Design a protein with these regions (language model features):
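Active-site rim helix/loop that mediates acceptor-substrate recognition in acyltransferases
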Residues: 1-4
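Acyl-donor (CoA/ACP) binding surface of acyl/acetyltransferases
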Residues: 6-121
Length: 121
C-alpha cells in the first residue's frame, strides 16, 4: 500500500488561505529508507522564500522524525526555479528519469535530484 504525508502551507496570519502544498511519497523502509518529495506554491507567493523555509522543515522532519536516509525529488527540466531551489537546499542532480511522468497525454522526462542524510562528503 502506498503511503504518503501531505502538508498544506497557509498564508501567515490567514489560516484559511492555502498558498502551497508539500508531500512525502513513496516512503520506503527496509534496505532503502528513502522517499520522494513533491511541492507546489501558488504563483502569487513564489520568489518570497516561503518554499525554501517550508522545505527546510520538511527535510528536517524526514531525516529526524521519519529517520529516512535519502530524499528524492523529480523536476521537469524546464522548471528552472525548482532546480535552483533544490540546488540551494544541497540536493544533487543525479540524472534524467526518461519517460517518468504522464503529463498532458505525453510521457515526459524529469531530472532526478537526491539529498542524503548525514555529513556531506
Amino acid at each position: 500500500q502506498q503511503k504518503a504525508i501531505r502538508f498544506w502551507l497557509f498564508e501567515k496570519g490567514n489560516p484559511d488561505h492555502i498558498i502551497g502544498t508539500m508531500s512525502i511519497q513513496r516512503i520506503s523502509r527496509g534496505i532503502f529508507q528513502s522517499c520522494v518529495i513533491g511541492y507546489k506554491m501558488d504563483a502569487a507567493y513564489r520568489d518570497m522564500g516561503y518554499m525554501t523555509e517550508a522545505l527546510h522543515f520538511l527535510i528536517s522532519f524526514i531525516f529526524t522524525e521519519l529517520k529516512l536516509h535519502r530524499i528524492e525529488a523529480y523536476v521537469n527540466p524546464d522548471n528552472n526555479a525548482s532546480i535552483h531551489l533544490l540546488k540551494k537546499l544541497e540536493f544533487t542532480e543525479e540524472g534524467i528519469a526518461h519517460g517518468s511522468a504522464w503529463i498532458q497525454g505525453v510521457w515526459q522526462d524529469h531530472l532526478r535530484f537526491a539529498l542524503i542524510s548525514g555529513p556531506k562528503s
